[in-house]
Amino acid sequence: ICNLLINSKFLPQLHIVLLDGIGFGGFNVVDLPKLAETLQLPCIAVMRRQPNLEAVVDAMSRLPNLEKRKELLQRAGTIYEYPPFVFQVCGEDPEIIAKVLEKLTDCGKVPEALRLAHLITAAVMKGESGMTSV
């Protein structure tokens, strides 16, 4: 993520970094504090619901580097719940982030930018954006 943004023309335009959860492609866990520090921006991992951490660790135990993955999960910090939002944040006060998420969310629990990114990715990968696409 850092490599994509550091030398891009877009970095100066960013105010926050929104992530759809703390992991990519399964259990490739993001180092949220390092990301926030490197980019000098608040970084937020938004979740649709409170995760079952015991089940997450159990699933990760089947993969290599369990201890490193657990460390990254812990480094990401507290999981905050400001209904309807569940998130982890580094680089800003959680109360401020809850207000920011409200402004970025049209309806539901997911900020529009993440919802749109998901739709675009699904369309590119599957040729459609959902089960109802024709």
Task: Describe the function of each predicted region.
Residues E92-V134:
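Charge-patterned, long linear interaction tracts outside catalytic cores
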Residues L32-Q88:
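Long, charge-dense
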Residues I6, N65-K68, T78, E102, ...:
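Generic secondary-structure signature for well-ordered alpha-helical cores
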Residues G21-V30, R49-N52, E92-E95:
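Gly/Ser/Thr-rich loops at beta-strand to alpha-helix junctions
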